[in-house]
């Protein structure tokens, strides 16, 4: 079983495509900047997994710049 589940993540970000984009950008930032993350501990060892955990925890959100 994957954690967090895609269904739970889609409650935070409404589109699978947006979810992938946000997670990928955060994972890339964590990798390039050697960022340890905003959560005290992670279940995943990989950057994308950590980004998804941050989204699930509500620490990482998608900002909509529609005007």
UniProtKB/Swiss-Prot annotation:
A biological-process GO annotation: DNA-templated transcription
Cross-referenced Gene3D superfamilies: 3.90.940.10
SMART domains on file: RNA_pol_Rpb6
Sample GO molecular function, one term: DNA-directed RNA polymerase activity
Catalytic activity field: RNA(n) + a ribonucleoside 5'-triphosphate = RNA(n+1) + diphosphate
UniProt cross-references to SUPFAM superfamilies, sorted A to Z: RPB6/omega subunit-like (SSF63562)
Entries under Pfam families matching the protein: RNA_pol_Rpb6
InterPro entries documented for this protein: DNA-dir_RNA_pol_omega, Pol_omega/Rpo6/RPB6, RPB6/omega-like_sf
Entry's family note: Belongs to the RNA polymerase subunit omega family.
The name this protein goes by in its record: DNA-directed RNA polymerase subunit omega
Organism: Listeria monocytogenes serotype 4a (strain HCC23)
């Amino acid at each position: 079983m994957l954690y967090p589940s895609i269904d739970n993540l889609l409650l935070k970000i409404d589109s699978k495509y947006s979810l992938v984009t946000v997670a990928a950008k955060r994972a890339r930032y964590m990798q390039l900047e050697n960022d340890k993350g905003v959560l005290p501990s992670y279940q995943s060892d990989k950057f994308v997994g950590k980004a998804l955990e941050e989204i699930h925890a509500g620490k990482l959100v998608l900002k909509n710049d529609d005007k």
